[in-house]
């Protein structure tokens, strides 16, 4: 990160994040039979457990969000390395069947 000095373009934010210095983003595939049928209370409990482990591990690893499907949960994390993502899963007792580093993010604006 670098601070934008006075006199630089006012269209820029106060802090400009250099793409090369950003931490990697990971997608974690967790095989959990019946995940799509978990109650809101069960999902809350899983989320609380994850957040508890994250608070012990420190600010370098962050959970962004998760997608719950029929038998899997796909979680998106920011972390310095895959080992830290797998350590979070180990400490929380969560499966981490596949951990993939995100190479790029595209959306409809990519086509413009």
Model-derived regions, located:
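Short, intrinsically disordered, mixed-charge
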Residues: 48, 52, 56, 87-94
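Short S/T/G/P-rich N-terminal loop/turn motif that feeds into the first structured element of a domain
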Residues: 14-55, 62, 107-112
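Short beta-strand-to-loop capping motifs
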Residues: 30-32, 76-80
């Amino acid at each position: 990160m670098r601070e934008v000095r006075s006199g630089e373009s006012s269209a820029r934010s106060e802090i400009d994040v250099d793409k090369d210095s950003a931490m990697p983003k990971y997608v974690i595939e967790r095989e959990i039979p019946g995940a799509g049928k978990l109650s809101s209370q069960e999902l809350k409990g899983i989320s609380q457990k994850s957040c508890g482990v994250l608070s012990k591990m420190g600010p370098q690893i962050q959970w962004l969000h998760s997608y719950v499907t029929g038998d899997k949960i796909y979680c998106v994390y920011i972390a310095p390395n895959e080992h830290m993502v797998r350590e979070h899963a180990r400490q929380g007792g969560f499966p981490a069947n596949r951990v993939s580093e995100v190479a790029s993010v595209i959306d409809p604006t990519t086509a413009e």
